[in-house]
């Protein structure tokens, strides 16, 4: 199994269990998330609760709907950004990330990241923002949105911000 960690914070953000599609010459990865139902069933097979003045229900089901990627990697949702805040974040993130890349990859990243950033700005009002479990200030941001008519979210990752770790 391969886990993808945030290059800046070390948080686990994705794994090879979730296939991705490259966008903007590999700058962004697009990953389809799914709503899943999780829960536990409590079955009470004890004495007759009605005779003891208790609850007459013998089975209690606690179900919760979660997005698989958010739940698996314990992503933490962040408040939305306005355009000015988002541009400030993107500039700082690109600067921090570029220092971690090889010179060759830096040039390729800087050439293609502008198109990816423009696309994110164009979807800004539709995006949800997530960070890794540590909530590191300078870590990668994971973006989620719903494609037209979709019931499951689509996630976007900066590919260069991920480090592959074999488990």
Swiss-Prot record:
Protein name: Translationally-controlled tumor protein homolog
Keyword hit for Cytoplasm: yes
Alphabetic keyword roster: Calcium, Cytoplasm
Compartment(s) where it occurs, according to its Swiss-Prot or TrEMBL record: Cytoplasm
SUPFAM superfamilies registered for this protein in UniProt: Mss4-like (SSF51316)
Pfam families: TCTP (PF00838)
Similarity field: Belongs to the TCTP family.
Tagged with keyword Calcium: yes
């Amino acid at each position: 199994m391969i886990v993808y960690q945030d290059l800046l914070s070390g948080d686990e953000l994705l794994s090879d269990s979730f296939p991705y599609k490259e966008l903007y010459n590999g700058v962004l990865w697009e990953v389809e998330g799914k709503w899943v139902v999780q829960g536990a069933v409590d079955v009470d097979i004890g004495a007759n609760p009605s005779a003891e003045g208790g609850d007459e229900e013998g089975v209690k089901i606690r179900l919760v709907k979660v997005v698989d990627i958010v739940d698996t990697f314990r992503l933490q949702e962040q408040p939305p950004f306005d355009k000015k805040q988002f541009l400030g974040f993107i500039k700082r993130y690109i600067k921090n990330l570029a220092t971690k890349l090889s010179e060759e990859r830096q040039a390729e990243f800087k050439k293609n990241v502008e198109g990816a950033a423009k696309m994110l700005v164009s979807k800004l009002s539709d995006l949800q923002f997530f960070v890794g479990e540590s909530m590191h200030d300078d870590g990668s941001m994971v973006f989620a949105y719903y494609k037209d008519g979709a019931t499951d979210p689509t996630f976007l990752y900066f590919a260069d911000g991920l480090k592959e770790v074999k488990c």
